[in-house]
Each structure stands twice: as C-alpha cells, then as structure tokens.
Amino acid sequence: MDILETTVKELINTGVETPEGLAKTKRKTSKRQKFSCPDNISLLKTYHELVKKKKVKKYPLLEFLLQTRPVRSLSGIVNISVLTKPYPCPGKCLYCPQESGIPKSYVSGEPAVERAKALHFDPYLQTKSRTKMLESEGHPTDKIELRIVGGTWSYYPRSYQNWFVKRCFDACNGKTAKNLKEAQKINENAKNRIIGLSMETRPDFITPSEIKRLRKLGATMIELGVQSIYENILRINLRGHGTKEIILATKLLKDAGFKVLYQMMPNLPGSNLKKDEKMFVELFKNPDFQPDLLKIYPCALLKSAPLYKWWKSKKYKPYSLEQLIKLMKKIKLKIPYFVRIQRISRDIPSQLVLAGPAKVSNLRQILMEKMKKEGWRCRCIRCREIRDRYSQKEKIHLFREDYAASEGKEIFLSFENETRSKLYSLLRLRRSSENRAIIREIHTYGRQLPLAPTSGFLVSPQHKGLGKKLIKEAERIMKMELKLKKITVISGVGAREYYRKLGYKLENTYMAKSLKN
C-alpha cells in the first residue's frame, strides 16, 4: 500500500473534520511511514480512485478539505462555459476580432477557446470535461450554472441550438436522451443539475418569439452585447442597431423573468472618459436600462479587428492604464446594491493586444488592491458576497429595495449583515408592465455544499432556509401589497424540484403557484 492510499484511509478512519485535523493527520502518517508529506491534489486523486474501486466509502467532508482552488465554488454554484462552433455573425462591429476558425468576437489563447478547440467545439465533451475537472478538484457539481458563449447565439441555426443544448444536458445527465425535452426532464433529478443557463446575443435579435424559444431551451439569463447606450457611438462602431433596440430587449427579457446582463465597453471610438462615466450613471438612473449584471470589457485593440486601421492612421487612441483605473473606480463607486459586476476585462492574451490598458488582464485585482489601500468600498454583489467569511454568530438582516425598471417595478430582497458589507442571499421580484408577478432570481451565496452535506467545520449560508424565507416574503408582498393571486418563477431546469417542494407546479416552462386568500 503506497503512502497516498495509506494517508487517504487514515484520514477517513480518523474522521478528520477540520483543515487543522487534516494537516495533523497528514504529518503523523507521513512521519510514521517515513515519506514526505503528500500534497492535497495527489490525495484527492487517490481518494477518487479508491471510491471508484470501492476500496473506501465516499466521504464528502474529506473532498471539501482536499479541495483545490476553492474560489470556484464560493458563490454557491459552479460555473461551466461552453463555446459554440465558428459561425458567421450579422454584425460588422469596428472593434470585433475576425479570426478564422474561431467564433466571432473571440480569439485564440483565451482559456475557454483553447479548451473548446481541443475538443472540436463539441458541447458534450466540453461540458463533461469541465464537470470532471471540477469534481477532481473536490468541488460539488450538483448545482451548475451553464454559460453558452461564442458569436451571436440567436443567429445560429435552430437545429444546431437544440442539438447543442441537448448535448450539454446529456453530459450532465450521464445518459443520452431522445430529445431536448426528455433531457431536461432527466436533469430535474440528475446528479449534475443545470440550475441556470445563459446565452450571449444581440439586442436586435430579442423578440417575443425569440424569448419563447430561449425559454424552451431552458435559458434563465441573457447576456446582451450592449457596449454603449449612445446612438452616435453605436453608429460610429457599426453596431447595426440603436438605443431603442436595447431598451425593448431589456423590457421583453425582464417581463419574461430573465436576468439581464449588459456587456459594456468603455473606450470605444467616439467616446471619452467623461462620456463613459456619464454612461454608467445613466444605466442606473434611467428606468429603461437597469441591468442586473454587468461585464465591463475595455475596448481591446486587436490586429484582426477593423479598428486596427483606425489606430494605425491615428483616428483612435486607447486610454492609459491610469485613466482606465480612475474611470473604473468612479464606476464601481456608483454601482447600486442590486447589481453584480460579473467580470472586468477579458482573458485575451496580452501579446495580442497592440496598445492600451486591455493588455492588463488582472484589472479587477488591481482595483481590489486599490480599494483596500484607499479605504473605499464597492457595493456590487460580487464584492459583497459572503464567500468564506460566514460566521454563525453574526446577525442577518432583511433588506428591501424597490425601483422602477422597464415599465415595471423591481423589488430586490436580500439577507445581509447590518453594514451591508456581507451578502448572504438575494431574490429579484418583478411586477411586470402587464401587472404579473415573477421571481427572476434566487441565489444563496457562500461555500457551495452538496445537496446532502455532512456536518463538520463546513459552515455556509447554504441549506439554512434563507432562500425559502425570501420566497415566503416575496409571496407575502405579492398577495398583501400588490394584490396579485399568482406568482411564477423562471426556474432553471435543475431547480424545478426545489420549487415543487414549496408548492409550485410546472406551467409551460415556468414554475407557478396560486396565492390563496
């Protein structure tokens, strides 16, 4: 018996429950066996092999203790991104790279692109390999948010869309279904449940019929390539649509219950620092916009983009890094409590960026360090997520924010600490322009726990009933304040069973519940 197998069995037999206990048992075993102390990655791999061979019983707590890169599941779920095949896009955007053999707007060298290329852009293989990788690192994969990226999703053939999504579900289900509907039904109780599904598309492709189709696929969030909300800047950059399409798409999506993410691009041709700052103020001042999430991608100057010629002829000049950091600080200080900045900057290899601050790939890290040094705070959801800072002793408070958005009313409910620096759980409730009630999001943050966790040092807001309490409050608001008799939820396929236990029933693609008097 080698040192790895011996150590794993010793850890299980002693019932190790804490990081300190893990380290102590490892040292003790290696000293007794006269071997150097094994690393956690090797131990985790050996543990999985022993479980597979049925030499040891599954011990979830040990998986957590041996977990590598814990940040991957500190938001309460795990994210998996899959890339579509290269396909034309109707857009002719000035800044967009046009690399052969790659979905438009993406470039070789980006991690997701390289993984997809190695697997021939196969959705099943991409989903399967990422799931296996997360499991091998000790992360639970029973709650997955799947993100489909690459080009303009709505422009791909419908047959390809159906096949692509079905194969993602097949990979999570561990079996091949006859059709998409069957694959979704299987996923409701599968080991790896897709509780959220998002796609990228253009605002001018969002129509009532497209929304119905997106729901049939199981989508719960749409990433809109907005980039700018100013007509002249959209026109200069050859976006092919205007502000009215952005406003309409946002309204249609929110009324249908979708979470709406705006991809925004500071430093576009035609803009400047003052305009960019003003734009982010307008995003949350004007009810026509009010996105739930943001991805802020400073314009990257790439040789394969038409913008390259502008730069060569000195018609375009990127911001300096110092200018961008100052701008980003101003933006972050203006973000409301109900918005999550999902990402800042792309994973584009720095050698491909010819000039400008987009060469810096760790912009968010720079901003976080600046925030800490200067003593200011960003109110966005990501900066306030509880992550691994949870303490059972700290008192949790219910907060509520009402705001107008897209001809409707949004009610943002959240459980936070008193100073609102730690966010535990949130719910987005909407009264639509047609006076209907829909829950657009429920999310509890903190270390992701399996659906049937073991007790031990693993303390997390998960499985504490916070989500259920928020749902109960949302139902009370709908019934007592808004006088509505029915509430619906835009549930991910893998989350349907959760809502069934709360009295909700599947109606078309939504979970619905009648509120009795």
Locate the predicted segments by residue.
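Flexible, acidic/Gly-rich N-terminal and inter-domain linker regions that tether
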Residues: 1-126, 130-175, 337
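Flexible inter-domain linker/hinge segments
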Residues: 41, 45-77, 187, 191-193, ...
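Conserved non-cysteine loop/helix-boundary elements of the Radical SAM core domain that shape
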Residues: 108-126, 146, 150-261, 265-322, ...
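Radical SAM enzyme [4Fe-4S]-AdoMet core and its adjacent flexible, acidic
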Residues: 298-339, 346-387, 451, 457-461
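A conserved beta-strand-loop-helix scaffold within acyl/acetyltransferase catalytic domains
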Residues: 395, 400-447
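Conserved acetyl-CoA-binding loop-helix of GNAT-fold acetyltransferases
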Residues: 456-477
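Conserved GNAT acetyl-CoA-binding A-motif
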Residues: 476-491
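Conserved active-site alpha-helix within GNAT-family acetyltransferase domains
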Residues: 491-510
